[in-house]
Design a protein with these regions (language model features):
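A positional/structural detector of protein chain ends, strongest at the extreme C-terminus
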Residues: 1-5, 591-594
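Structural signal for the C-terminal ends of transmembrane alpha-helices
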Residues: 111-121, 177-182, 238-243
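Intracellular juxtamembrane helix-capping segments at the cytosolic ends
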Residues: 170-177
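Transmembrane alpha-helical segments of multi-pass membrane proteins
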Residues: 124-138, 159-166, 186-205, 249-257
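Membrane-anchoring hydrophobic segments
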Residues: 2-168
Length: 594
C-alpha cells in the first residue's frame, strides 16, 4: 500500500484563491444590455414570420392569378371560336360538337399535365401564344374545305385542330400551377378534388358571362370583331407567358393583318371583293352584329342582290329587273305574306286606315309593299344592322315605324301598357336553319292574338322540313290560339326529292283569323299587284297544305315557354338540312369567303 502524501504538501500545491468575478459594468442606456438582445431577437423572429407570410401570400396569389388568367382567356376564346365558325357552318351546327369537344379537351389537359410537361421540349405556357395566334390562320384555310367536311363534321374537325390544343395546354398549365396551391386548411377528402371542381365552375362562369357580352357588343368596334378578338386573345396569352418563341408568331400576325379576308378592315374587304368578283359576285357591305355576320352582295351574272346572315339568307331582290313601285323579290314566299290583305273579313278596312305590325324585317319586302299600299306599318327587328342594310341597299321606304327591339319583350310590353291593336300582323323570323323558339311559343302567339283586332288577320312564315316533327308542333300550337287557319307552301310538293333525299324542306305561310269563320281570299286586283311580275305569280297562295302533308308520326305537343324541349331536340337536324339547301342556293366559295 503506497504511503499517503502529507497534507502540508497538498496545501502547498493548491493554487491561490481568486477573488470572485464581478459582472461587467454596462451602462443601462446602452444597446448591449440583455434586455436589448432579447428584444432584438424577438424583432428578428417577428420579421422572419412576417416575411414568411408575405412570401406565402405572394406565392399563393401568383398561383391563383395565373390559373384564373389562363382559364379565363381560354373560356373567352372558346366563345369567339364558335362565332368565327358560324358564317361558314351556321350557329347550330357549330354548337353540336362544341361543348363535348371543350369538355374532352379539358379532361385531357387536366389528366395529362405532368406527362405533357415531360414530353414537350419547352414549357407548356410558352406554346400558348403560338397556338392562339395561329388559330385564325388555320381556320382561314380549313374554311375552304367546308364543302367536303360538311356541316356535321366540319366544325368538329376545325375546332379539334385549332381550339382543342389551346384548351388542352391551357388547362394543363392551370393544373400544374394549382399543384402549388396550399390547401392545408381544407379537410383531407376535399384537397384532391377541389382544384378541379373549382376550375370547372370558374371556366363555366367566365364562358357564360363572356358569351352574353360578346352577343351584345360583337361588331361594335374593330377590336370586337371575330378574327381581331382572336388576335387580341393571342396577344394576351403572350403577355401571360412571354418567351423568345414569340418571334415565331410573326408569320401568323402578318397573315391576319394582310391576308385574312375575314378581318373587318377596308383593305381586307377589297381583297375579298377581288376573290368574289372572280366568281361573279360583288360585296357591297358587311358587318358583324348580334344575330351574326351580316353582308349584302350582288350576283353579277344573274342580276340579283341578297342579304346574308351567317349561313342563311334573309332575302333578296332582282336588280336586273326593277319593279315600277316596289322591288321584285327573288323568293315568292315574301309576296305570299302580302296576301294577308287579301283575306276576306266581315268589314274590310281601307288601306289608308289600316295598321300593320311586322315581326322580323329581312330585306323589307313585305313592309315595303304594305307601305306602298298606304298601310301604317310598324316593323320590329332585333338587329340594327339588318335594318340599316335593308334601308341602305334594298328598297325599304323610310315612311314606316322601326322598332329595334326583341319582339318578345316589345309585344309583351305593348299588351300590358296599351290598347293598340292592328289589322294585320306578319310574323317572319326564321333564320339560320331553325326557328327562334321563343317567337313560336303559345305565350308569344297569345300576345300577338291580343294585339290583333277582332276582324284582323295574321300571316306566319315558317321554314322547315315536313318530314320532321317541328312544323307539326308549330302548326298545332298556332291553332291553339287562332281557331281558323289555312296553310300554303311556297312550292309544290316534290315526291321525287322526298324519295331521294328523305326530306321536304320548304317555306310555308299560315293565314289565321280570330274567329271561327273559314279563311278565304278575295280576287287580287291590279292595285294589289303593285305592277310587279313576281306578285302576279305568288301573291295569291296556291299550294295548300293538308294535315296528311305533315309526315311526322309523333303526336304534336303545345310549345310553351317552359317546355321547349320537344322542338329544340330537332334543331340540329333541321339546321343541317338547311345548310345543305343553302349550299345549293349559293356556291361554297361565297359562303366560305365571308
Amino acid at each position: 500500500m503506497p504511503p499517503k502524501k502529507s497534507s502540508a504538501r497538498s496545501k502547498q500545491q493548491q493554487p491561490p484563491k481568486q477573488p470572485p468575478k464581478q459582472p461587467p459594468n454596462i451602462d443601462p442606456g446602452s444597446s448591449f444590455t440583455p434586455e436589448s438582445f432579447e428584444k432584438e431577437l424577438k424583432n428578428l423572429a417577428a420579421r422572419a414570420k412576417d416575411e414568411t407570410w408575405a412570401r406565402w401570400l405572394l406565392e399563393q396569389g401568383s398561383v391563383y392569378l395565373r390559373s384564373s388568367l389562363l382559364l379565363g382567356l381560354v373560356a373567352v376564346y372558346a366563345n369567339v371560336s364558335e362565332l368565327t365558325l358560324s358564317p361558314v357552318y351556321g350557329s347550330i351546327p357549330v354548337s353540336i360538337w362544341h361543348d363535348r369537344l371543350v369538355m374532352a379537351a379539358c379532361f385531357v389537359g387536366w389528366a395529362c399535365n405532368l406527362h405533357l410537361g415531360r414530353v414537350l421540349p419547352v414549357r407548356m405556357a410558352y406554346l400558348l401564344p403560338l397556338i392562339a395566334l395561329y388559330i385564325p390562320v388555320a381556320q382561314f384555310y380549313l374554311f375552304g374545305l367546308s364543302g367536303t367536311l360538311t356541316a356535321y363534321h366540319g366544325p368538329l374537325i376545325t375546332e379539334a385542330l385549332t381550339l382543342a390544343p389551346l384548351i388542352v395546354l391551357s388547362v394543363a398549365c392551370t393544373a400544374t400551377y394549382l399543384d402549388g396551391a396550399d390547401l392545408s386548411a381544407l379537410p383531407g377528402f376535399m384537397r384532391d378534388a377541389s382544384p378541379g371542381i373549382a376550375s370547372y365552375f370558374y371556366y363555366r362562369l367566365v364562358e357564360k358571362l363572356s358569351a352574353g357580352l360578346l352577343a351584345r357588343y360583337v361588331g361594335s368596334a374593330i377590336f370586337q370583331t371575330r378574327v381581331v378578338m382572336e388576335a387580341v386573345l393571342g396577344a394576351s396569352y403572350a403577355l401571360v407567358a412571354p418567351s423568345r418563341l414569340l418571334a415565331f408568331t410573326l408569320p401568323a400576325l402578318l397573315h391576319t393583318a394582310f391576308l385574312n379576308t375575314h378581318v373587318m378592315t377596308p383593305m381586307a374587304t377589297r381583297s375579298l371583293n377581288s376573290t368574289l368578283q372572280a366568281n361573279d359576285w360583288l360585296l357591297h357591305d358587311r358587318k358583324e352584329s348580334l344575330t351574326g355576320y351580316i353582308s349584302v352582295a350582288d350576283n353579277l351574272k344573274t342580276g340579283y342582290r341578297v342579304m346574308r346572315c351567317d349561313h342563311s339568307l334573309l332575302g333578296g331582290e332582282w336588280i336586273r329587273y326593277k319593279g315600277a313601285r316596289v322591288a321584285e323579290p327573288i323568293y315568292g314566299v315574301f309576296t305570299m305574306l302580302e296576301g294577308v290583305r287579301l283575306v276576306e273579313v266581315a268589314e274590310p278596312v281601307p288601306d289608308s286606315e289600316a295598321r300593320a305590325l311586322v315581326i322580323g324585317l329581312g330585306i323589307g319586302t313585305t313592309p315595303a309593299a304594305l307601305v306602298a299600299h298606304g298601310v301604317d306599318t310598324t316593323v320590329v327587328e332585333i338587329d340594327p344592322v339588318v335594318h340599316e342594310f335593308a334601308s341602305k341597299y334594298f328598297q325599304l321606304p323610310s315612311n314606316h315605324t322601326p322598332v329595334i327591339a326583341d319582339a318578345v319583350t316589345y309585344t309583351a310590353d305593348l299588351v300590358n301598357t296599351t290598347t293598340d291593336q292592328f289589322d294585320y300582323i306578319v310574323h317572319d323570323v326564321f333564320t339560320g336553319g331553325a326557328e327562334p323558339i321563343a317567337l313560336f311559343t303559345l305565350e308569344f302567339l297569345q300576345n300577338l292574338e291580343a294585339l290583333l283586332k277582332p276582324d284582323g288577320v295574321i300571316a306566319i312564315n315558317y321554314a322547315g322540313d315536313f318530314t320532321l316533327p317541328p312544323p307539326k308542333i308549330i302548326v298545332h300550337t298556332i291553332k291553339q290560339v287562332f281557331p281558323s287557319c289555312r296553310i300554303f307552301r311556297e312550292n309544290q310538293r316534290d315526291e321525287d326529292v322526298i324519295e331521294k333525299e328523305k326530306r321536304d324542306f320548304t317555306n310555308m305561310v299560315i293565314f289565321c283569323v280570330k274567329t271561327e269563320r273559314p279563311v278565304t281570299f278575295r280576287r287580287a286586283t291590279a292595285a294589289d299587284l303593285l305592277q310587279s311580275r313576281t306578285r302576279e305569280h305568288f301573291l295569291v297562295p296556291k299550294h295548300e297544305v293538308s294535315d296528311k302533308d305533315f309526315m311526322a308520326l309523333e303526336e304534336p305537343s303545345v310549345l310553351r315557354n317552359n317546355d321547349t324541349a320537344a322542338l329544340a331536340k330537332w334543331h340540329e337536324k333541321s339546321a343541317l338540312g338547311h345548310w345543305e339547301v343553302m349550299r345549293t342556293v349559293l356556291p361554297d366559295v361565297i359562303w366560305e369567303q365571308w
